[in-house]
Amino acid sequence: MSKPPLFFIVIIGLIVVAASFRFMQQRREKADNDMAPLQQKLVVVSNKREKPINDRRSRQQEVTPAGTSIRYEASFKPQSGGMEQTFRLDAQQYHALTVGDKGTLSYKGTRFVSFVGEQ
């Protein structure tokens, strides 16, 4: 039986290290969001986006194939001025928003909690 080349062992090691780093980074971000205080701001919905998750990067693919998972994002701009913030949302939360809506945004760290529109 021949010995695998050192090059492939190094590449596999780098992949394992990179995957471990990313995993720990995600766990740290989740813990930070869980510990963050609930913050609320008066905002305006400034933008909404739907992105296919498994984008095949094909330049000729103009229509998203059926069954493709979608990532929903919405951007909010503070009514008092300031930087726009973008959050990932569930489909139900996303479809309840309309660009230009004003209301109270609640969030913890980088995690969207809720948006309550003004009456």
From Swiss-Prot:
* Native source species: Escherichia coli (strain K12)
Q: Under what name is this protein listed?
A: Uncharacterized protein YhhM
Q: Which gene encodes it?
A: yhhM
Q: Which Pfam families match?
A: DUF2500
Q: Which InterPro entries does the record match to this protein?
A: DUF2500
